[in-house]
């Protein structure tokens, strides 16, 4: 921080004022809680015929079904729509799960005598292919013959989550010049302050990155400025332990934490403006540019989930569980292909 006489000094000293302000900000505990994102009208989405949470099979193709985490699936019907309108003689139903084993007696599988399946309390590990075989008879009255018929219906069921919120933050600081090593040190110190501001929320700062530009500004000469960007996300170490203590899913909680963290950081920079005007006789060489703080919300997916509007067209924008052979280690928003021969199961955060 520059002292009397207007001499430029180190970025560490320039940040002393920020540290003092940070202490005040941390004690204030400001910030209104974030609004919970409204749940969709239907928690389950299907490609096939859709009638009040009932999905019929199709002998020609597998039906894709998307079930929100910790909710119950629609009723999966072991026949197609046209057959359901007919009289069925001596029907027998047999359901198998993704592991190829019969679902009879499984606690999470609610089976009815009419061949319907509901999956209860859906989780990512329950994703996969559910297959039903319908055996019945057709009586040819003219020939007095009975024909045994066996139809197979396949449902690909995927867990999905609502997107989490990540915030892209942009700020600007003045600098003495663009070639100084002090700029990088300043940005690293700034990151430490941001992380300490929001550490109790188990939120983290990803980045930051910066570029330095020389500007032509009226009445200011040709100053240099640091254009700094970073992301605020709710996935700092400890977030999984926090979520495990909640009774069900914690998207609403993580979204509220990310919003509060961003509000704290915004308040911190607003206090910088006040400090520069009222607490410094000499403006530091590196200081915040008033009004440069801006926030852009970015939807992201939790590790193990990703978005793919081509593969999952009927659930565009959903964070769908990563399929076997893919993984998502962070909140980047997409599932990556595993490079090795060994493949992970559904919802992988890393490759084996």
UniProtKB/Swiss-Prot annotation:
Glycans are attached at residues 110, 309. Residues 1-28 form the signal peptide. One of its GO terms (cellular component) is cell body. It is found in: Secreted; Cytoplasmic vesicle, Secretory vesicle, Acrosome. Pfam families: EGF_Sp38_C (PF20626), Sp38 (PF07354). It comes from the Eukaryota. Keywords: Cytoplasmic vesicle, Glycoprotein, Secreted, Signal. One of its GO terms (biological process) is negative regulation of immunoglobulin production. Belongs to the zona pellucida-binding protein Sp38 family. May be implicated in the gamete interaction during fertilization. This is Zona pellucida-binding protein 2. It comes from Gallus gallus (Chicken).
């Amino acid at each position: 921080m520059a002292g009397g006489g207007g001499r430029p000094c180190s970025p560490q000293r320039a940040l002393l004022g920020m540290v003092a302000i940070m202490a005040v900000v941390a004690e204030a505990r400001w910030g209104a809680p974030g609004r919970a994102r409204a749940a969709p009208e239907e928690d389950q989405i299907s490609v096939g015929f859709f009638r009040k949470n009932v999905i019929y099979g199709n002998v020609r193709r597998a039906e894709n079904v998307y079930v929100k985490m910790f909710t119950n699936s629609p009723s999966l019907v072991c026949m197609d729509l046209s057959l359901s309108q007919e009289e069925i003689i001596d029907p027998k139903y047999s359901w198998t799960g993704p592991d190829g084993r019969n679902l009879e007696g499984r606690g999470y599988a609610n089976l009815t005598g009419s061949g319907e399946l509901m999956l209860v309390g859906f989780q990512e590990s329950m994703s996969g292919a559910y297959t039903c075989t319908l055996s019945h008879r057709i009586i040819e009255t003219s020939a007095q013959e009975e024909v045994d018929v066996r139809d197979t219906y396949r449902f690909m069921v995927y867990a999905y989550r609502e997107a989490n919120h990540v915030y892209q933050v942009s700020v600007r600081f003045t600098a003495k010049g663009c070639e100084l090593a002090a700029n990088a040190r300043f940005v690293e110190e700034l990151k430490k302050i941001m992380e300490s501001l929001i550490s109790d929320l188990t939120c983290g700062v990803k980045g930051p990155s910066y570029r330095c530009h020389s500007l032509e500004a009226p009445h200011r000469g040709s100053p240099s400025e640091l254009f700094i960007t970073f992301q605020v996300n709710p996935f700092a170490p400890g977030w999984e332990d926090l979520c495990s203590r909640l009774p069900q899913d914690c998207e609403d909680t993580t979204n509220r934490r990310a919003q509060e963290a961003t509000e704290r950081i915004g308040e911190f920079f607003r206090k910088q403006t006040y400090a520069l005007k009222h607490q410094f006789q000499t403006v530091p060489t590196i200081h915040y540019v008033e009004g440069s703080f801006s926030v852009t919300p970015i939807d992201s997916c939790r590790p193990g989930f990703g978005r793919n509007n081509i593969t999952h067209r009927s659930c565009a924008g959903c964070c769908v569980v990563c399929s076997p052979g893919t993984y998502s280690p962070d909140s980047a928003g997409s599932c990556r292909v595993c490079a090795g021969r060994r493949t992970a199961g559904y919802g992988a955060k890393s490759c084996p």
